């Protein structure tokens, strides 16, 4: 399990986890946080990550990147997002959509793959437009 201790100002500034997301709530939260605050990366492992437990949500929901894409798109609709953060988020959406498209095609979910391909092309066009400006 994961534990996070919040300062009282966190709720006012960033809210809490998005409970409408069936999974990836922590991903969504830290996206919102890191879009507004500087994050320092420590180049030393401080945790031991273990996966594959039967009670993990990744075993319950297929295509976990669907929820990450949703979080990224939600971030992209936030007012005042800096262009550098916006373009980084768009690149990540494109990457996650490519993974989702590949997995959908592998599982013969062609209609879903096509709809994700259209979404990917939309974001690629937005990114090209922003980079041309």
Where are these regions (language model features)?
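Hydrophobic residues within well-ordered alpha-helices
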Residues: 33-34
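Residues that mark the junctions of alpha-helical repeat units in TPR/alpha-solenoid scaffolds
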Residues: 86-89, 93, 113
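Conserved nucleotide-sugar donor-binding
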Residues: 2-15
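Active-site phosphate/pyrophosphate-handling residues
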Residues: 9, 28, 46
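Acidic donor-binding loop at a coil-to-helix junction in glycosyltransferase catalytic cores
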Residues: 16, 22-29
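Amphipathic alpha-helical repeat scaffolds of TPR domains
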Residues: 66, 70, 91-103
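Catalytic core of nucleotide-sugar-dependent glycosyltransferases
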Residues: 44-52, 58-83, 111-126
